[in-house]
Amino acid sequence: GLLGEINSIRAYWFRNNDWRRPVPSPDLERKINWRLYKEYSCGLVTELATHQLQVGNWALRMLPEKVAGMGDIVYWKDGREVYDSINLIYHYPNGVKMTYESMIGNKFYGLEEEILGSKGTMEPEKGKYYFEDVEPAPGIMQLINQIEHKIFDNVSFAGPSWVPETASVNKGHLIMDKVTTISGQSSVGAAGDGSIELVTAFCEAAITGKPAPNLVEEAYYSSVLGLLGLQAIDEGRVITFPD
């Protein structure tokens, strides 16, 4: 396909807030701030991760066979019970791993899913894909660039045995001609949060009597991936997926 052979998938969601809401009376703490307590909430794996984990299944057209993970309360040491930082690794039958990371103590990188193939990379949240090999600039442009950066000033007879491989800076291509992306922090007040597409799909399904393809399956498996990931964290072991 366009991305070549998919050999890795990464997903993450970073926020910087405590999830707490004001409580008018102490006896209402667990009811109002239910997200913080294991009796009511699975924390990051169900609040955030389940929105992204199905991307791996969709890209690979298969389900993982096992998962390992770690979680801790790293920053918000305020009496909560659920983790504020998690890392998960899902292993697929073909050897591909999907890594997932989430925390609520830093929001710099926001959220993203990254599908990494031998020929290119896709970032759905940005609505872009990137090819591994970018067309080089014309010869004259390369020469001007080298002169401007004084490439020819010094000639080295010996050098390091390795060169740092920094991230690609190519601008990529839009997946669709018109695409709206939003910050992972909040969709309130955003120009588009996907609601129109969801309502449109619902109306189409209601009118035609045909549900959106794989909708229930993707929701189910995303939930299962999240819950088994939490089990792996809580039990400190690799969880093999049941048949």
Residue spans for each PLM region:
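Acidic/polar loop patches that form or flank catalytic/metal-binding clefts of enzymes
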Residues: 6-7, 62-70, 97-101, 122-125, ...
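NAD(P)-dinucleotide binding in Rossmann-like oxidoreductases
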Residues: 78-80, 94-193
